[in-house]
């Protein structure tokens, strides 16, 4: 296989067993990275990703952890270091499952649990992973942390409010960590995603999917592979002077 932009580097992908995380893990492997595929419950799916990565000629390990548990995140980082000796990239793609009924609820009807879940998984889960990997990155004087935000967290929307709260927090976390760890050689960025064709979107009706496809300037949904290409770019030295940014990957949705 040709030498890629990430040859010899080690990437942790949380939520790497399916959806966006799976696409990201495979694209990083195509660019030369060895992979730690974090999963919460999908052991078989995570192992299938590991086998695909190995089929690309890279090393890979599936490691179970809970991103909502700081201790479990520290164990994840420790196992990654014990297995591969370094952590160069952390792509935080573990997220709260999409639920149509929760997304469309009026803000005043959201329960405390519905408000809290995206904060626990998307925001705090990403923060806990960052806490776990940043010490080794700072010590090495290099590293790239990539979070998942959203376009609605920038533009605002009348639905998906609990999700927007968590993703807006991600954007703040990105900027703060970029300032704190930039002097130590670590870059921190986020993606602001629009409508992407992942498995949870199958819960959206065909009519609503068609409506959503008309919203961005490109008049279509994005693919996981298109997101993954941006992640590989941010993880590589091609993005060596980019930090603290929310890279908008939304087909022009924010231009409305």
Label the model's feature ranges:
Residues 2, 155, 210, 215, ...:
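Short C-terminal tail/terminal secondary-structure segment
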Residues 10, 17-18:
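Conserved glycine-rich cofactor-binding loop
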Residues 43, 64-76, 112, 225-226:
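The beta1-alpha1 cofactor-binding region of Rossmann-like NAD(H)/NADP(H)-dependent oxidoreductases
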Residues 101-119, 201, 208, 212:
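Substrate-binding pocket helix/loop in short-chain dehydrogenase/reductase
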Residues 108-127, 142, 146, 170, ...:
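Catalytic Tyr-X3-Lys loop
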Residues 130, 166, 174:
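Active-site helix of classical SDR
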Residues 135, 179-183, 240:
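Alpha-helical segment proximal to the catalytic Tyr-Lys
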Residues 216-227, 238:
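A conserved structural motif in NAD(P)-dependent oxidoreductases
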